Amino acid sequence: MILGNVCTRRCGFCAVQKGAPLAVDYDEPRRVAEACAALGLRYAVITSVNRDDRKDGGAELFALTIEAIRARISACKTEVLVPDFQGSHAAMEIVMNAHPHVLNHNIETVPRLYRQVRLGARYERSLDMLAHARRVRPEIPTKSGLMLGLGETLEEAIRVMRDLRAHGVGILTLGQYLRPSPKHLPILRYVPQQEFDELCDLGRGMGFTHVEAGPLVRSSYHASEAV
């Protein structure tokens, strides 16, 4: 995770510290690249907190990190899990023009639950950013993920999957929401593996090239297998 450990938003599912973040550390891309090299990584997933305090939402540091990894260990593929950059197409273009191997932006939940789950985000804005990523660099696959168990219906989840496909997303992750602490949103349902399997089959039928679905699936789960 780059851009510090303090987030400018207060999503109801997330345990990351909230508040006023520190200044951007421009030596961070070099250190991340050195860590990738030291670990001998062949696939690195880079994510961040939301940085609504910055005009580009932190896009520049994502690009610098991608470039630093490529320069230090060219065999290492990069996947970036980015925030919505407050809907800035220019910010998304900065990231895409650094040529990550996969662009991930999680839709997280169904539109009806956005106010409780993703305070400060908008469903349509996230879809638009995913679509814009494809417009900028159609050769780079896009990815998104959905947490289940927050009160969504099966029909709502399927509609989100269809929306993601309609906006060019090719890689999908579906996982069980797990509550980080008693202060966070409650788990309203534990989704059985059979339902995850059914959604996986549906997703493949919709045209997703790769689907990971199960209670413990997260954004980076088996990420390298999708490319």
Q: Which stretches of residues belong to each language-model region?
A:
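Structural motif
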Residues: 35, 49, 79-83
